[in-house]
Amino acid sequence: MVDIAREIFAASGFDVEYRNYGWARSLSLARENRIDGVIGALKGDAPDFVFPERPMGTARIGLYTHPESQWQYRGLESLNGKTLLVINGYSYSPELDRYIADYTDDPERVWVISGAAPLGRALRLLAQERTDTFAEDQAVMSWFLREHSGYPPPRLAGIAHQAPVYIAFSAGNPRSGELARLLDAGLARLAETGRLDVIKASYGLSTSD
């Protein structure tokens, strides 16, 4: 998404500076107008933000386990007796978000982690069998495993949710509407020329991702 945003905004004279923060902090910084927007947002993550009309792709939220686990995700009831690992501030699905809110104070059922590199930590916790399952977007997981060697690939135990994913802009920033419109126009242009598919393919993503 960063490469797509850079190409689109460069055409309008903007430089995109990407900074890596924990998700909850990213949302807070955007709300304080200290950054312009956040990458990879579902509408449930930040309903108060300004969203473009066009999504950047589709998020597919998977439930991952230790490679030797045989457990399958079949809805919330299948989480009984399991510890679900999640990242602070993320939205996963309406169903999972309610479950997390209900049990966020019960570490036997929901374990919330944060920080600038939570995915690597989550994979280590899975490998050490300190948690049962971890929720993450499939494309993010695939990219991370390609870019970071040394992590044992987890096992996908089921898909919990699919939803459009966006770059979202702070509602308090007076230029957020303009940035959202530029992004929409740029995405349409890249899709029409085929450039969007080329960028996605460089990350192992298809048109639908």
Q: Where are these predicted regions, by residue range?
A:
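Ligand-binding cleft/hinge of the Venus flytrap
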Residues: 5-12, 54-56, 90-116, 123, ...
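Flexible hinge/capping segments at coil-to-helix
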Residues: 66-84, 99
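Alpha-to-beta junction loops
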Residues: 14-15, 31-40, 82, 118, ...
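Hydrophobic/proline-rich hinge and linker segments of small-molecule sensing/allosteric domains
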Residues: 53-74, 167-170
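Extracytoplasmic small-molecule ligand-binding "clamshell" domains
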Residues: 1-49, 115, 183, 189, ...
